[in-house]
Amino acid sequence: VLLVPVLLSVLKLPTKTALATSQMVMAATTVVAMVLHARAGRVVFRTGVLFGLSGMAGSFLGGRLAHYISPSVLLSGFVVLMLASAIQMLRGSRKKTAPKSGAAWWLGMLVGFPTGLVAGMLGAGGGFLVVPALTIFGGLAMEQAVGTSLLVIAMQAFAGSLGYLGHSTVDFRLVGMLASVMAVGSLGGAVLSQRVPAAFLRRLFAALLIAVAIQMLVQTFF
């Protein structure tokens, strides 16, 4: 989520180029994280592919529709997504969602489409939407939902970036460099998460999201 503000503020990329670049980088780095979860047995591929396919359709359409939406509207939507992610992190996992037996696959796939649409349009992963959908409609335990969501997000990000490529220019060398740096960073983050309390990390990241969201709003409208 924080990659887009960096691309906008530090690298000064145009809004739609930043969103397209973010999706490509996310597709690559999420695959790396997904492989680690898969080796630990936390990825249910059948469920992930079913959700991911409907999400890909929505994400590709979202990427195409972004061509007709003004950058300020897209940034406003991205800010809302950041704030929603921050709220979800602050809430934590107070309520454990019990996986449903006989989960409604068809309903889950229907949910995947609008989730992908929003993610593809705004250049974000939408993990805070995917994980609950996998637990409620996919019948997965929380640990499996988190791992499987990485597969869904990777599929959505790939499709969304293809949708953006029809109307946005992307520097593939920059994508490769950012993906490499973030892949290494994710490994460091995994080590850090084992040494620092999860609740503290959630609050810290949520505060960072809120601060960056406010900064983006100020830059966009003032």
PLM segments and residue spans:
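Short hydrophobic/aromatic, small-residue-rich stretches within specific transmembrane helices
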Residues: 22-26, 52, 149-153, 174-175, ...
